[in-house]
């Protein structure tokens, strides 16, 4: 673990980060639909969008010819992710709509016991599956009778997210309060004809419990923090990304005890805009391009992550991994999400903030869908 002097030497030569996100970026109004005159509005929004009218999108091919209704239906991909992290445990839950199949996974890693509970499910053609079409108000439901029931609920007033999971050996009920949080809300062009919209939030405390194999863990008592990823759009048929996310209380320095959240990615936002950002006490600060260095053949080795010309420098030490690997003709995916601990700093308006000890995730994803 590097000491404060080492961190200071690393960052002393870099410029300050910009002012808070809402002061430096021109925002589009979130209270208007995403699709206007058949085209998506591209850029940053001042809030998560309540109207994602995908059906109004005109999905032409590169030669200006309209694609069929089936191609339009098949081309739209959606996924939602809810994560929780603390010094006691780390958990993640993802639900994805690939049209011809719906996929869900849940894992819980007990840091104290160093044990991983993990399971994934697939539902052909999305049977027993409903997906909220925005992250402000709605419900996502993945259910296989007598096997698993996952319920993700978005509520606008008061602004909060709730996740309930019931399956053999695992019972989760968790709520993340997002009042006072500025989400990252952005839409970018993807490929020639497509687009990707995402709303992300991190760094908010969690309430509720995780019951794993009859052990009941109160999330407020262990100071668990959460993250939410809502993504939809017309993404590339073959694509990839790396992603990092963290949330929790700062553990050292002048900001000790304050709330922090982090979202970093590469390979997702192709042009003009970046979803990379840092949250401090609910306030969102922009970050530019991020770089991920890791051993692609052994992703459990340490990762190095930098952003904003080095104003953010992190090392991530994985504790374990959830993996999905499918080679099935039309669908090919190699997904690896590592969970573990970050070390490093960010320089924010000239102030060095230590992020040592924060828990979170990194991800390496290849998919052809």
List PLM regions with ranges.
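N-terminal amphipathic/basic-hydrophobic helices that include classical n-h-c signal peptides
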Residues: 1-22
